[in-house]
Amino acid sequence: MTYNNQIRAARALLGLSQGDVAALSGLSVPTVKRAEGQGVIAASSDAIAAIRAALEASGVEFIAENGSGPGVRLSKRKAGT
């Protein structure tokens, strides 16, 4: 499961704007804003998948909730390139 705070954190980690993420994912800026909103994510699962794929392709790894909570980090694969 991807959480809205993970999307915001991944975008910030990469230094991307909501417009950048929209362009990378092929979605609109309002859709990205809904995905990052507080509370329940108000974007479709397809939109979340597209955003996540775009952020992962840009060098972020999503960390599953494993007792310590969900998170994001820079991917080792991208960090060395």
Task: List the predicted regions and their residue ranges.
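Helix-turn-helix/homeodomain-like alpha-helical modules used for DNA recognition
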Residues: 60-81
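Recognition helix of helix-turn-helix/homeodomain-like DNA-binding domains
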Residues: 26-43
